[in-house]
A protein has these predicted regions:
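Phosphate-ester processing/binding pockets and catalytic centers
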Residues: 1-274
Length: 274
């Protein structure tokens, strides 16, 4: 391909779950095993090949290290760290080394966050008044549209790897959501985009960039769910935009964190009464 063709590489994953109610219709958000927030993140990685090589090299060194031989997640049959880094499953010492490595990569991270209590209360009201059930995929697709609205017009070829959500194949729906994001940008700014958009659902073991965005989301999730900022702080400069859509203390569309408004634990505390 000609050298003047501009590429953008994006990697998409989620954190949290989309569980809202028990079998009797009671809201269970925040109970053990159920997250308070749901977030979707996009990592823009300048050089995916280098990232892949360095992550694979780190994994190979760790797999060969005697100290980690007996750790279950390092065993090939466990299908965890041995095939892909995953912040939730990785041994603490290994997680530290992954965090240290990914800080050096040329990465920009964009995240959209929903408070599940807010979603659940609206959903319950809609069901009572209209008989309308909550559509979980619609929540995910809406965040995809918000994230990609301003990310699709700066390259000739946009390659998007999206972490598979369970066994469900939703390529067509994701393509529609991303195409709508492109249309929303054009409608707002009156700028047309001729980018060629290539979308491919994948597993983190297949695409190293998905392991990167998983780590960034895990660090942010710990900040939101547990008010722990020790993982977030070293990575903070890489998060270019965090859209907290249900924190409407100051603006009706939510709180947007960026260089102009850096996210801190102090800002999150007291953000919601629920």
């Amino acid at each position: 391909m000609p050298e003047d063709i501009k590429f953008r590489h994006y990697f998409v994953d989620e954190a949290g779950d989309l569980s809202f109610f028990n079998k009797t219709g009671r809201i269970i958000v925040g109970q053990p095993g159920v997250s308070k927030f749901f977030m979707v993140g996009v990592a823009q990685i300048a050089d995916p090949e280098t990232v892949t090589g360095e992550l694979n090299a780190l994994r190979a060194r760790l797999m060969a290290h005697p100290r980690y031989k007996g750790i279950y997640s390092m065993q090939p049959e466990a299908k965890k760290t041995a095939i892909a880094f995953h912040a939730k499953d990785d041994y603490a010492e290994i997680r530290e080394q992954v965090f240290e490595l990914i800080q050096s990569f040329d990465i920009k991270v964009f995240v959209a966050i929903r408070s599940k209590v807010e979603i659940a209360e609206v959903a319950r009201a809609n069901f009572k008044s209209l008989g309308k059930k909550l559509q979980q995929n619609a929540i995910y697709d809406d965040l995809i549209k918000r994230l990609f609205r301003n990310l699709l017009h700066k390259a000739d070829v946009v390659q998007i790897a999206i972490a598979r959500r369970g066994k469900e194949a939703r390529e067509e729906a994701l393509e529609q959501a991303i195409n709508q994001a492109q249309k929303n940008f054009e409608a707002k700014w009156k700028i047309s985009s001729n980018s060629s958009i290539l979308i491919g659902p994948a597993y983190p073991s297949q695409v190293a960039g998905l392991q990167i965005v998983d780590y960034y989301l895990w660090a942010l999730q710990r900040l939101y769910e547990r008010e722990e900022d020790q993982f977030f702080k070293p990575l903070a400069q890489k998060y270019r935009l965090i859209m907290d859509l249900d924190d409407k203390r100051n603006k009706g569309y939510g709180e947007w964190y960026s260089d102009r408004n850096p996210l801190t634990l102090e800002k999150l505390r007291g953000a919601r009464s629920k």
